Every structure is written in C-alpha cells, then in structure tokens.
UniProtKB/Swiss-Prot annotation:
EC numbers on record: 2.4.2.1
Keywords per UniProt: Glycosyltransferase, Transferase
Catalytic activity: a purine D-ribonucleoside + phosphate = a purine nucleobase + alpha-D-ribose 1-phosphate; a purine 2'-deoxy-D-ribonucleoside + phosphate = a purine nucleobase + 2-deoxy-alpha-D-ribose 1-phosphate
Biological process per Gene Ontology, one example term: purine nucleoside catabolic process
CDD domains attached to this UniProt entry: PNP_EcPNPI-like
Full protein name: Purine nucleoside phosphorylase DeoD-type
Subunit annotation: Homohexamer; trimer of homodimers.
Species the sequence originates in: Shewanella oneidensis (strain ATCC 700550 / JCM 31522 / CIP 106686 / LMG 19005 / NCIMB 14063 / MR-1)
Length: 234
C-alpha cells in the first residue's frame, strides 16, 4: 500500500494496461475481464485485477500528464511487482496521412518535459517502446484486421500550449501525433528495467481540426483496448 494506491502487494498482475481515464479502466474490467476485482480507488484512480483468456491482467488509470503517469508507474513497479505496462489512450494527429480513428503504435516518443532528463543526470536519453511488445502488437493487429500505423509520437507538457511553432515542427519531423504521457512511461520503463508500449487512437486532428464523436471514439477505442489485451497475453 502506498499514499496513492491502496492495494496489497500481490493485488496487481505483472502486466498492467493503463488508460488515462479511470472510468475507462472500469469499463475494460467490466467488459473484458472475468472475475475482476477492484484493488485500488484512492482519489478515484480506479484499478482492477481479473482474467483475460485465463491470464491474470490488471488495468488502472494513470491520469493526465507525464508527472501523473510516472507517479503511478513508479509505485506499481517498485511496490507491486509490475513488470510490463501498456498505455492506451488518445492522440492528436500531426501528419496529413494519419486519419481519424487510426490506431497508432508508438515506437518512440519525444517530449518538451524535463522529467526524463531529471532522472538521467540532465542527459536527453532516447525513449522507445520495448521491441518485443511493439512487434507483438503489430502482428496481433494484422491477425485481427486492425489497421495500425507505427511511428514516433510527442508528449507535450501543456494541453493548452501557446507555442504556435510546435505542431508545424512535429509535422516537419514526421511525428505521427501528440499526447501527454508516452515519453514519461518509456523513460520510466528504461530506468526501471521493465517492458512498456503505448497503443493510441487518433481522437482529433491537429492539422484539419477534425474531432471524433463520443460514439466514434468508443468504437475505435474498443479496437485499441482489444489489441492491448491480446498483446498482454503471454
């Protein structure tokens, strides 16, 4: 038990799927897991453990931003024995060829946050997904007929960023889209020696101004959720 997770040391599976929204964690537990049990609820950051196709899997929200992602990830790894974290969430597209509701496998992530540099003596280390998880997710997507794009993303510290040059710069560098957490997860995973992957769905387009409806988001997010669950299986 920690100040932010009121679970017992063995309550979490070694693999945790982490959406930003704790209510999405609840939805996944109730929709996809069998024998799911709520294991933490501090500050309503809900976490559950259950079974998917006979394998023990946990799901827990991580909140918004790198600081929140790293806080919960650090505690899961160091106090609850978690060995693998798969983030799922939304992404704002920054390339014309990336379309609404596309599923993105984030192979690496840049950031304007100082968080990763602080944990690496001021150096800007590369932050990338675990290749075995990335390859497995890509293979599973092809098997399930889910169209995915693989590439780099960018994790911004500010949702309402006043820098008008950011999106054009990301477009020039071929970055597929922008979120707020992936770089923090990958940096933490490298430092702690665990496996990590982010599977994201394009919910809005930074170049065209398009946005998904709630119904469209639910359908496309289900593809992402199911792909994450399949990737989590041993």
């Amino acid at each position: 038990m920690t100040a932010h997770i009121n679970a017992q040391p063995t309550d979490f599976a070694e693999t945790v799927i982490m959406p930003g929204d704790p209510l999405r964690a609840k939805y996944i537990a109730e929709t996809y897991l069998t024998d799911a049990v709520e294991v933490t609820n501090v500050r309503n950051m809900l976490g559950y453990t259950g079974y998917y196709q006979g394998q023990r899997i946990s799901v827990m929200g991580h909140g918004m931003g790198i600081s929140s992602m790293v806080l919960y990830g650090h505690e899961l790894i160091n106090f609850f024995g978690v060995k693998r974290i798969i983030r799922i969430g939304s992404l704002g597209a920054t390339q014309q060829h990336v379309e609404m509701r596309d599923v993105i496998l984030a192979q690496a992530a840049g950031t304007d946050s100082p968080t990763n540099a602080k944990r690496s003596s001021g150096y800007h280390m590369a932050t990338s997904a675990t290749f075995s998880l990335l390859h497995k997710a890509y293979t599973k997507a092809n098997e399930k007929g889910i169209s995915v794009k693989v590439g780099n993303v960018f994790s911004g510290d500010l949702y309402y960023d006043p820098d008008e040059d950011m999106i054009p710069a990301l477009e020039r560098f071929g970055v597929l889209g922008i979120d707020m957490e992936v770089a923090g997860l990958y940096g933490l995973a490298h430092q702690q020696g665990i496996e990590s992957l982010a599977i994201l769905t394009v919910s809005d387009h930074c170049l065209t101004g398009e946005e998904t409806t709630a119904q469209e988001r639910q359908l496309s997010f289900n593809n992402m959720i199911e792909l994450a669950l399949e990737t989590a299986l041993n």
